[in-house]
Structure formats: structure tokens, C-alpha cells
Regions:
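C-terminal accessory "lid"/substrate-recognition subdomains
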Residues: 61-190
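Phosphate/Mg2+-binding loops and adjacent switch elements
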Residues: 1-106, 113
Length: 190
């Protein structure tokens, strides 16, 4: 993810550090940044926040209501009351019930409906681009370390690919060579 962000945002500093305060200070003092955007920063209260932004998946807004590791929530649903802007993602239909649920906790935040739409396929190493119809009729195996692998897999299916095998890892998973080799060997047999 950080590599992808840095590649697609020239001139924007992308820092990765478990100590976000240290990274924030470095960005401001050494790199001259005047704005910091944190991934998963809503629950990170050690840095002063000017604007609280939250993304809510409209297809599974609050999961089973439990916090990690028993559920998908990083903090209780009621804490959404701190949000200034709520992006309601994966909106493909009527989301009024989800908005009503959000309004139970936050009556003032702006709610923005959005949807993920792929535009192009890109080789991460060569940066070569392919049109979306390149997937039409292709048989695919997926290897993913993202929060919502089913959404990724369904996007491939909607683009006409036949997804026959999926290897899913936790969000932000760091692949090691044995995992990649396993996937390559598994797909070679198909």
C-alpha cells in the first residue's frame, strides 16, 4: 500500500512508522508538511486531529458489532459520533438504512456516498497498463492481503474473469517468498 501510494502521488511524502507521533514530527519539521493524513487514524488519539474522517462499508457497515479480533470494528460504533465526514463506500443501491443507523450516533457529519470503480489494470513492477476488458474470459487465481477480499474477487468477476482459487491473508499482510512460491506452484497445477 505505501509503495502504491508513493508511486501514484508524486511529490507527496508517504511515511510508515509504528510511532505516528515521531513520523508526524519528522514530516512537519524535516519535510515541511503542513497536513498529515493517517491511515486508520480515527482511533489514534495521540496526534491532534483537525478533521475526523471515517470510511464505512455500506455492504457490511458495522459487521457483527464486535471489536477486533471478534469483529471488524477497531472501536465501538458509538465513537462514530466524533466523525466530521463519513464516506459510505461500495454504494450500489439504496443505502438509506445505513445512513439512518449512522444518524443514530452522529446527526451532524457529512455523509458522502461513493463506489469503487476500476479504471485500468496495472502491472505493479513494469507499470504497464491494460484495459479492463483484458480480463474478459481469463481464468484467475487471487492472492490478497486486504480488508475486503470478497469485494476484490467480485470486482474481477464483474469484469468477466473466472476466479477459480483465492488465497486470502490478513489486511496489510507482508508476503514472504514461501507464500508467493506456494501460490505460484498451486496455480501451475491448474
Amino acid at each position: 500500500e505505501p509503495y502504491m501510494l508513493a508511486s501514484n502521488l508524486p511529490g507527496v511524502a508517504v511515511l510508515v512508522d509504528r510511532n505516528r507521533v515521531k513520523a508526524g514530527r519528522y514530516a512537519v519539521k524535516r519535510l515541511g508538511c503542513d497536513t498529515l493524513i493517517l491511515d486508520d487514524g480515527f482511533q489514534y488519539q495521540k496526534l491532534k486531529h483537525s478533521i475526523e474522517v471515517v470510511l464505512v462499508d455500506s455492504t457490511n457497515p458495522f459487521g457483527n458489532g464486535n471489536l477486533l479480533p471478534r469483529g471488524i470494528l477497531r472501536e465501538p460504533v458509538r465513537n462514530i459520533r466524533r466523525a466530521d465526514i463519513i464516506f459510505l463506500t461500495k454504494c450500489r443501491g439504496d443505502v438509506s438504512a445505513v445512513k439512518e443507523e449512522i444518524r443514530r450516533y452522529n446527526t451532524t457529519a457529512e455523509i458522502v456516498e461513493c463506489n469503487h470503480t476500476p479504471k485500468v489494470l496495472k502491472d505493479v513492477w513494469s507499470r504497464e497498463e491494460f484495459p479492463l476488458d483484458w480480463l474478459q474470459g481469463k481464468t484467475l487465481c487471487t492472492l490478497s492481503g486486504i480488508a475486503s477480499p470478497k469485494g476484490f474477487e467480485n470486482s474481477l468477476r464483474h469484469l468477466g474473469a473466472k476466479v477459480v482459487w483465492c488465497e486470502r491473508y490478513a489486511d496489510h499482510h507482508r508476503y514472504d517468498s514461501s507464500e508467493v512460491l506456494y501460490a505460484l506452484n498451486r496455480t501451475a497445477d491448474m
